[in-house]
Amino acid sequence: MSFGSSERITAAQAERFGQIKAGRCVACWQRGMVTIGCDAHHLLSGGRRIGHEASVALCLWHHRGHPLPGVTPPQMRFQYGPSLMDGSKSFRAAYGTDEELLQLQEQMLRGEA
């Protein structure tokens, strides 16, 4: 289902965002780490947001490239892997396609991962 970025968020979408923001980062989870407290990253198609349902949980490192306090970006890359800010190609190579990330996010929200 496609939504414009200016479309109002429904109650169900707001609940999903709340679960994502309180949940685990999908990239950290793939590396066997748990990082709770995330941004809801909207997946894109052709440079445009697909819709509010097409969003995944990413920690501040994986979403915005913000390292943990006292840790340098190279140290973060070594331990946590690439950030989306390092470029989408390296991020997707490490963690999967948008479709794979969304599938994993849905499994995590259902408690299956």
Model feature map: region roles:
Residues 8, 42-48:
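Short helix/strand-bridging catalytic loops that position acidic/His residues to coordinate divalent metals
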Residues 47-56, 64-113:
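Polybasic, low-complexity binding patches
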Residues 35-43, 67-72:
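Short Cys/His-rich "knuckle" micro-motifs
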Residues 10-39, 61:
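Short cysteine-rich loop/turn motifs with clustered Cys
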Residues 1-3, 7:
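Charge-rich, low-complexity N-terminal segments
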